[in-house]
Structure formats: structure tokens, C-alpha cells
């Protein structure tokens, strides 16, 4: 009998609302469904305007796949699950990098860490990021049947 390994994975994709150069607002996904937990990913963004004093981080969950289309998902295809604002340093320009890091734990906690020069802010959401015990058991049962040829 082959050994079957079941891994805990994200049940949804998570990203932030971003404004693109063409003015469109889309979800920029950082982490994707079916990625193994725990996971940590960082992306760099930039202020939309010169001398922008604050940014609003809007976090969305959605079902996008980790492919070219999934990197930019329409906002109406996602559900907003949290938001927060962060002050930007004085003198921030459109070229000032803003690092956004998503950390998803096996315990079902999603943390968004945002940093820009000397400013930092964190926001945590307890969410159903992972498969439930029932879903894991069901997957394990299916895998065992596949491996055993039943």
C-alpha cells in the first residue's frame, strides 16, 4: 500500500485592491487557493499619486487560480474581508515602494504586513483559510481509493 500524504492548503486566493496604470481597479492576488500552508508572499506596490499621505488596503478573497489571469482579478469576482489605512511618510512619491506581505498560517490566520520606508502596519484576519477536518478526511478517503484502485 502506498503512503498518501494530505497537505493543508488554502481554500481561497487572497489579494488587495490595486489601481493599475490604466485606472482600472482589480484584485492583485498575493497567495492562491491550493497553495500549501503555511505560506508567505510579498509584492511591491506604489502610491497612485505624488505626495499621497495615506493608502487604503482592501483585502479580498476570491477563487482565482495561480496563473496570468489570476494575478489580476476583477473586484466583483471577490469578497472584501477586511481593510485598513496606513499613513505614508512625508515626501513619498509615485516611485516610493510599498511592500505588502501576506502570511497565512495553518491555524487559519491571515496577516497583511505593509511597510513603506519607516512606516509599518499589520492587520490580521481569522478566516477559514484551510480545509476543515471533514474536508481533509474526505480528501484522504478519496486518495486512498485512488491509490488502492477502488
Region locations from a protein language model:
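Acidic low-complexity intrinsically disordered segments
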Residues: 1-150
Amino acid at each position: 500500500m502506498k503512503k498518501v500524504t494530505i497537505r493543508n492548503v488554502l481554500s481561497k486566493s487572497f489579494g488587495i485592491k490595486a489601481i493599475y496604470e490604466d485606472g482600472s481597479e482589480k484584485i492583485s492576488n498575493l497567495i492562491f487557493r491550493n497553495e500549501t500552508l503555511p505560506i508567505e508572499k510579498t509584492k511591491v506596490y506604489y502610491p497612485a499619486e505624488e505626495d499621497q499621505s495615506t493608502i487604503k488596503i482592501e483585502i479580498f478573497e476570491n477563487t482565482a487560480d495561480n496563473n496570468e489571469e489570476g494575478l489580476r482579478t476583477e473586484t466583483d469576482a471577490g469578497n472584501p474581508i477586511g481593510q485598513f489605512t496606513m499613513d505614508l511618510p512625508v515626501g513619498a512619491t509615485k516611485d516610493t515602494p510599498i511592500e505588502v506581505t501576506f502570511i497565512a498560517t495553518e491555524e487559519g490566520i491571515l496577516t497583511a504586513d505593509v511597510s513603506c520606508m519607516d512606516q509599518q502596519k499589520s492587520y490580521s484576519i481569522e478566516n477559514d483559510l484551510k480545509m476543515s477536518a471533514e474536508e481533509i478526511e474526505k480528501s484522504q478517503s478519496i486518495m486512498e481509493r485512488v491509490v488502492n484502485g477502488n
